[in-house]
UniProtKB/Swiss-Prot annotation:
The lineage of its organism: Bacteria, Bacillati, Cyanobacteriota, Cyanophyceae, Acaryochloridales. Keywords: Cytoplasm, DNA-binding, Transcription, Transcription regulation. One of its GO terms (molecular function) is DNA binding. It comes from Acaryochloris marina (strain MBIC 11017). It is found in: Cytoplasm. This is Probable transcriptional regulatory protein AM1_1847. Pfam families: TACO1_YebC_N, Transcrip_reg. InterPro entries: Integrase-like_N (IPR017856), TACO1_YebC-like_2nd/3rd_dom (IPR048300), TACO1_YebC_N (IPR049083), Transcrip_reg_TACO1-like (IPR002876), Transcrip_reg_TACO1-like_dom3 (IPR026564), YebC-like (IPR029072).
Amino acid sequence: MAGHSKWANIKRQKARVDAKKGKVFARLSRAIIVAARHGSADPNGNFQLRSAIDKAKAAGIPNENIDRAIAKGSGQLDAEGDQWEEIRYEGYGIGGVALLIEAMTDNRNRTAADLRAAFNKYGGNLGETGCVGWMFHQQGIISILGPVDEDQLLESLVETGADSYEFVEENAQAIAEVSTDVTVLETVTEALKAQDFQILDAEIRWIGEMSVAIADPDQAKSLIRLMDALEDLDDVQSVTANVEFMDNALAGL
């Protein structure tokens, strides 16, 4: 029985991994469709599309899937049923934390209902457009795989006009994150590539103007569960919160 139980657990874990992988593929494919629809189908002349393709390839999406998504977005392939649109939703979590949710949907009513259910379940509220948007600004973020020569990076950033940089660690990897104005994101990215920095990602992110400190473990748990629930929704592309968790709030989570 133990062996059977172990095998059942492995199958369930694999199903969860496969489901998550499927959602990632779907989100990245939709991002390619929208990018191709908004600009040129040639990634060389469309930075948004080029970035979406790079992310898709990094995630292991086959080239034929990428080509099909580009064809759908550019109108070269019948995309009936794939009329995706980008929508931003806003709301509050417990403790007054503001949340911005970026979604791609072919059914606004379905997406809004799913979001509202998640907010209600974890003590939040889905608000009207504009209720928290003023608490955030957009920033270009370029992620560079380390190790990075800081002197070389600083010299390059002075030349390109980037705003700032910081070193972070993600999945046990050292990464340099460069912040730029949105208008020069492409220029700075290409300049860093030309100087042989290994670019992992270049994207536009929402950044909170001020953070809300959460010290209570129960509030932290509710917020994390809310953000996880929102991110798990098929139509959701990203979730941003202006929250800073204090160390004691995360104890035991």
